[in-house]
A protein has these predicted regions:
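Canonical Radical SAM [4Fe-4S] cluster-binding loop centered on the CxxxCxxC motif
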Residues: 1-33
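Cysteine-centered iron-sulfur cluster-binding motifs in ferredoxin-type domains/subunits
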Residues: 8-15, 56, 264-269, 275
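Short acidic/His/Gly/Ser-rich catalytic and metal-binding motifs that mark active-site loops
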Residues: 14-18, 115, 180-186
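A short, flexible beta-alpha/helix-coil linker loop
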Residues: 23-26, 111-114, 179-180
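Radical SAM/AdoMet-radical enzyme domain recognition
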Residues: 32-52, 60-176
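Radical SAM enzyme [4Fe-4S]-AdoMet core and its adjacent flexible, acidic
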Residues: 122-130, 134, 138-257, 261
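Flexible mid-to-C-terminal extensions adjoining Fe-S/redox cofactors in radical SAM and related proteins
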Residues: 231-298
């Protein structure tokens, strides 16, 4: 195991429209002692790369102490997965960096402030997140932006990459919207925001070109490889490559087993030369769009 991600708790200062955490789960949380135990366990298994996530990890009063402890016991890379809102306070950002945070992974949910705030259901969140990203960059830390791909953002992925590259971001990933965890009625209401993979591909290509032109790294793990043209496969990777264990209160599982990353394979997948590097079709996606667009690559 090279990588561990610890979901510290599920409290958050956004109310994202696509995030459905059951009430009984929302109140679960690791204590500081629990977190240290899991950090120790991760190191005993050989992990040197750490993701700290949630929920929103920066809301925890012990977050700086947790980062410091992780560094002390030998984690070489500590990635804080945050919505970036509290990073708008430079003193807080610098405390995280001084404690040992080396990377900040920040999501962008819209192609403009209005779309981002609409998705977050947190007025002003884009503005504060943008300031937070700049503060993280000013601290000398790496910033990776996870771009949420929806029917709203799909056609402007390259614009998002160009803008954030202009302020210094050099790492991106494209995340296709997931409906996992939604009730049936909620999924029906929100399904119009989930684009078809085949519609995303050419817009993703433009984003890849924009990143290349900026000298930035970019990848996606959410577009099945049978849909990706051969010349775009260099931008594809699966979460399996991270050798990742995800740890949450009451749960522990491999990254490739996450319903956000894949799902059942089709009978025809057995004859696909890319099947070895594919995690299957997400069940929420198949319910909305079916599986007709997936053809085995010979």
């Amino acid at each position: 195991m090279k990588t561990i991600e610890i979901a510290l708790w599920f409290k958050c200062n956004c109310r994202c429209r696509f995030c459905f955490v059951p009430p009984q789960v929302r109140e679960t949380a690791f204590t500081t002692r629990d977190i240290k135990r899991e950090l120790d366990w991760g190191r005993s298994q050989g992990a040197t790369f750490l993701y700290l996530g949630g929920g929103e990890p920066t809301l925890r009063r012990d977050i700086v102490a947790v980062i410091r402890y992780a560094k002390e016991i030998g984690y070489e890379e500590i990635d804080l997965k945050t919505n970036g809102i509290l990073l708008c306070y430079p003193e807080f950002t610098n405390r995280c960096v001084e404690a040992g945070a080396t990377i900040f992974t920040v999501p962008i949910w819209g192609a403009n402030p209005q779309e981002h705030d609409f998705m977050a259901r947190a007025p002003g969140s884009f503005e504060r997140t943008e300031v937070g990203i700049k503060n993280a960059l000013d601290s000398g830390s790496k910033v990776q932006i996870d771009i949420l791909v929806t029917t709203l953002t799909m056609e402007r992925l390259s614009d998002i990459v160009r803008y954030f590259s202009s302020i210094g971001v050099r790492e991106y990933s494209l995340w296709i919207l997931s409906l996992f965890g939604m009730e049936e009625s909620e999924e029906e209401d929100f399904s119009s925001y989930l684009p078809r993979f085949t519609d995303v591909v050419e817009h993703a290509r433009k984003a890849f070109v924009a990143a290349d032109e900026a000298g930035a790294a970019i990848y996606t793990s959410h577009i099945p490889p049978c849909v990706m043209p051969d010349d775009m496969m260099k931008y594809y990777r699966t979460i399996r490559e991270l050798d990742l264990m995800i740890v949450a209160p009451g749960n522990k599982f491999r990254g490739e087993d996450s319903p956000f990353e894949g799902g059942p394979k089709l009978p025809s997948c057995d004859g696909c030369r890319l099947s070895w590097n594919c995690l299957g079709i997400r069940e929420d996606y198949a319910r909305v769009h079916g599986t007709d667009e997936f053809k085995p690559v010979k």
